[in-house]
Design a protein with these regions (language model features):
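Acidic, Ser/Thr/Pro-rich beta/coil linker or hinge segments at domain junctions
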Residues: 400-468
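Fungal secretory targeting signals
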Residues: 1-22
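Conserved beta-strand positions
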Residues: 43, 77, 128, 159, ...
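N-terminal catalytic cores of secreted or lumenal carbohydrate-active enzymes
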Residues: 19-203, 207, 215-223
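Aromatic/acidic polysaccharide-binding cleft in carbohydrate-active enzymes
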Residues: 287-374, 378-381
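Noncatalytic carbohydrate-binding groove/subsite architecture in carbohydrate-active enzymes
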Residues: 143-146, 176-301, 306-309, 316
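Carbohydrate-binding surface patches
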Residues: 366-410, 416-425, 469-472
Length: 476
């Protein structure tokens, strides 16, 4: 594919207020460092073998992200069904379960060595979620031994998924009320037992795995880890986050930059708790709306949310984000199934923006629908700027905003790639492009001629226009 350098795109639209963003010449002192592979994928436990063996786009789209990031994106294998799964050493297949409909997730399942062989075939970092809810620690230790022997690129093991949802009727609770304190005691006890089963292995657990910000938090669990001398088992703390659900789905609110800023801010104290122990904080499972609620998850707008959410999260110290891919054929927020889906464009653009980055800083105040991020290389020089107009556009007259950038180090021109679509509500790929290109459904590779916009710079100053529900990645 050849690169086409085009004039700055001039769009007939309704123009709104103008903004000015100044690009700092260096990143802020004490800013969070960016992980080389911040964009990851979480795959529902029972469905993982089919993602690898029956969906060619899994490897293709992971390879597309690798091409941009320079390393394979990390994957996490887990979810609700990890706490329904037991290891069976005699099982010849990867998994065994029955469901009434292919759209359903199983209520119970078993997995064998073949499952972990498939996980071990992935050359990037892998996190594996194992069962704690059923209170069979010996079975989990047996599974962990197979994980250790088969998964060469193992990052961590999770012991249970979203334990804040455990109930007193679950085996792990022994008929008692399940509280954050009970869970913390259970987590450290299981960490000790599994470590002993793995010859006193250290730094192997991704702890927490919560979906709650009240009492089931990294702060509270970290305190218990310190109290019991268990921090040596922990490699990272993680949380899960879905900002919306079927009962409150609203695409305009989902993509709103100010709402995204507020949502990520709720995790700042948990990031700090992990950092105080020199450990990473991970968003171990996340996506736009639980169970793809309300029809918003398959849209281009969800891709815009992914883009801004990744930028905001990495800036705030969340090292990696794992976007969940659920039941094949019944997954509204999935990035691919038999074809590439609209949200993948947001993930890809975030990977473009953060590739090789060491730090980022926010140029806006975080209280409006207009966002700006400056991205810095390893030497502390600004190399890219991401601008985002989160005004919601579905139909009718499309508004735009003028943004003036100052402090640009280039003397004459810079180039840019525009992420755009016919509307925030677009599903599939119709009308979506990044730099004028779209992803091939069979290859997950960009197709068509690249359209790089050229932006004039005068005395370190440039002006760009961005329509509602668009983003612009500028290369300095």
């Amino acid at each position: 594919m050849r690169s086409l350098i085009a004039p700055l795109l001039l769009i007939s639209a309704k123009w709104t207020n103008a903004l000015t963003f100044e690009i700092p010449s260096s990143p802020p002192a004490g800013g969070n460092k960016i992980d080389p592979t911040p964009v990851g994928v979480s795959i529902e436990f029972f469905a993982f073998p089919d993602y690898i063996e029956k969906l060619p786009l899994t490897n293709a789209c992971l390879a597309t992200l690798e091409d941009v990031l320079g390393a394979k994106p990390p994957i996490r294998i887990g979810g609700t069904t990890q706490d329904r799964a037991l290891y069976d050493a005699s099982l010849q297949s990867a998994v065994d379960y029955t469901v009434d409909s292919p759209d359903d997730a199983p209520d119970s399942l078993t997995f064998g060595d073949r499952f972990m062989e498939l996980a071990g075939s992935y050359e990037g970092e892998v996190t594996i979620g194992l069962n704690r809810r059923l209170d069979d620690v010996e079975n989990t230790i047996a599974a962990a031994k197979v994980v250790q022997s088969k998964v060469g690129n193992l990052y961590a093991i999770e012991l249970g998924n979203e334990p804040n949802f455990f109930k007193s009727s679950d085996p792990i609770a022994h008929g008692e009320a399940w509280t954050a304190a009970a869970d913390a005691a259970s987590q450290v006890s299981w960490q000790t037992s599994v470590s002993e089963g793995l010859d006193n292995k250290q730094s192997f657990v991704q702890a927490g795995v919560f979906f709650d910000t009240e009492s089931f938090t990294a702060e509270n669990l970290a305190a218990k880890e310190e109290e019991t001398g268990s921090t040596g088992y922990v490699r990272s703390f993680c949380h899960h986050f879905y900002p919306q659900s079927s009962s409150n789905a609203n695409l305009s609110r989902l993509i709103d930059h100010a709402d995204i800023v507020d949502g990520v801010a709720t995790f700042e104290s948990q990031v700090a708790a992990a950092q105080q122990l020199n450990l990473d904080f991970i968003m171990g499972e996340t996506n736009s709306a639980t169970q793809g609620g309300g029809g918003i998850s398959p849209t281009y707008g969800a891709g815009l949310w992914i883009l801004d959410y990744i930028m905001q999260s990495t800036m705030k110290g969340i090292q990696q984000l794992f976007f969940h891919q659920g039941t094949i054929g019944n997954c509204q927020y999935c990035w691919w199934q038999d074809s590439v889906n609209a949200p993948f464009y947001g993930a890809y653009t975030a990977a473009l923006a953060l590739s090789g980055a060491s730090q980022i800083t926010q140029l806006d105040a975080g209280d409006s629908r207009y966002a700006g991020y400056a991205i810095y290389d390893g030497d502390g020089h600004p190399t890219r700027v991401l601008l985002y107009n989160s005004d919601y556009y579905a139909s009718g007259t499309r508004s735009s905003i003028n943004i003036t950038l100052t402090g640009i180090p280039s003397s004459s021109t810079v180039s840019a790639k525009r992420l755009t679509a016919d509307a925030a509500t677009v599903v599939g790929q119709e009308g979506i492009s990044i730099g004028g290109q779209a992803f091939g459904d069979g290859s997950c590779e960009l197709e068509g001629e690249e359209d790089r916009e050229t932006i004039a710079v005068e005395n370190g100053r440039a002006e760009v226009g961005i329509r509602a529900s668009e983003a612009l990645l500028i290369y300095l």
